[in-house]
Amino acid sequence: QGPVYLRFGRLALPVFHDEATFKFEIGKGEQLTEGSDVAIIATGLEVNEALIAAEQLKNEGIQARVINLCTIKPLDEELVVKAAKECGAVVTCEEHSILGGLGEAVAAVLGEQCPVPMRRVGVKDVFGHSGPAWELLEQFGLRSDAIIAAVKELV
């Protein structure tokens, strides 16, 4: 049916959904938390960082909706637009270049269907490096503190 791209990280992460009831569906995202101040849309291991950020933001009075987008193409446009309309601001998070990834896909959809303030957390336009995963997340600004900073720029 065509090319497929799967990406697996090196880190052990928590399970975010009920394995007994969750059914993976290409092109469908999953809302993990309720929130109305900002939508944090994440993919891959950044979902864990987004959940950590949302918990800390909650302690500061900011209600963040965390969405896990397992697939970027096709993108769950309905879920993305709904979150943008209901929250009024969006932060995307990806362990990937901000060029050509989740952030650009979400920005394209929102630009046409629901323009809202938005920030992208991801690897800037630089060459990558090899090394221990947690060190690289810190080096490239992909930890929860970077997500929190991006949220605070918007709300």
PLM regions and their residue ranges:
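Thiamine diphosphate
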Residues: 4, 9-155
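Basic phosphate/pyrophosphate-binding loop/patch that engages nucleotide-derived ligands
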Residues: 1
